Amino acid sequence: MTPAAPASLLKNDIPNSNAIGSFVEMMKLKMVFHILITTFVGFYLGSKVELEMPLMWHTLLGTGILAIGAFALNQAIEKDFDKLMVRTRTRPLPTDRVSRTAAFVFGLLCFAAGTGYLWVAANPLTAIIGGLTLVLYAVVYTPMKRYSSLNTLVGAIPGALPPLMGWTAVQNNLGMGGLVLAAILFFWQLPHFLALALMYKDDYRLGGFQMLSVTDPSGEACYRHIIVQTLILVLVSVFPFLFRLAGPWYLACALICGGYFLLAGVTLSRRRTRESARALFFTSLIYLPVLLLVMAWDKAILFV
């Protein structure tokens, strides 16, 4: 078995040694912020004329609480395995700066608070989708990572639901616009996380996670899925234009950015290096916010 992190590593690399700082670190607020951006875009695109500001803030707050709870439960479940990975061994739980019990209790409280808050402040449909998102992430996806390489596909489902929550908060229905946004997020996550799995395949192997890059060491399956899923993403990204969620400027952006994303995937499949996997990963990080920003901007122009 791979040993836990040496004491010298833990002393020098732990970013927050105090209790409050460690708890905040466990919340993964940067990732929560990214989730809230997609939620806001769903809310904005679902709004007919003007933003209902109180409802928007209530939706973002409830969604943020649920996201924090999901991350806490995920880390509580994976504590022992995170100790084995270089990338995760200095997190609050593997270093015992936050106990597993505290993380579990905190995560469950966030689940109850976030779901209840959305039920009252937004609507029951949004609360149900939010609660389902947490359950899929923490109860289904997290343990599945140790047993099946399909975990990436399953994990993309909860990752795709926040923009749908934004849409349902204002529309109170599963409209085509919200489903299209969820589809874009779903297919974006697949090349994004497969690139990450290729970058850290040795680390995932140490942790015992059955990522596709671990179960297929040649990488052939990863490269094939990256190309196919990125192609599907480019096609799905045209739907907001077809359903009049955005206009021609967005369409041009979707095709240009999608083409560049696909080129990064093709480059990875040919070169098969960690550097090209990293390039695809960072391309995905640029692609999504640009796409969503132009979508929102073009929607504003379309309905002026």
Which ranges hold each PLM region?
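Multi-pass membrane catalytic core of lipid/isoprenoid biosynthesis enzymes
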Residues: R87-A127, P217-F241
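Cytosolic, membrane-interface loops and tails of multi-pass inner-membrane proteins
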Residues: T2-N18, I77-V98, L194-A221
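Transmembrane alpha-helical segments that form the membrane-embedded catalytic/substrate-channel core
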Residues: I65-L73, V135-P143, I184-K201, V234, ...
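Small-residue-rich segments of transmembrane alpha-helices in multi-pass membrane proteins
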Residues: I37-F40, R91-P94, C110, V154-V170, ...
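Membrane-embedded alpha-helical segments that form the functional core of polytopic membrane enzymes
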Residues: I37-V41, L45-K79, R87, F111, ...
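Juxtamembrane boundary at the C-terminal end of a transmembrane helix
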Residues: L293-V304
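Interfacial loop-to-transmembrane junctions
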Residues: S99, A221, G259-V290
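Intramembrane alpha-helical segments
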Residues: R100-V170
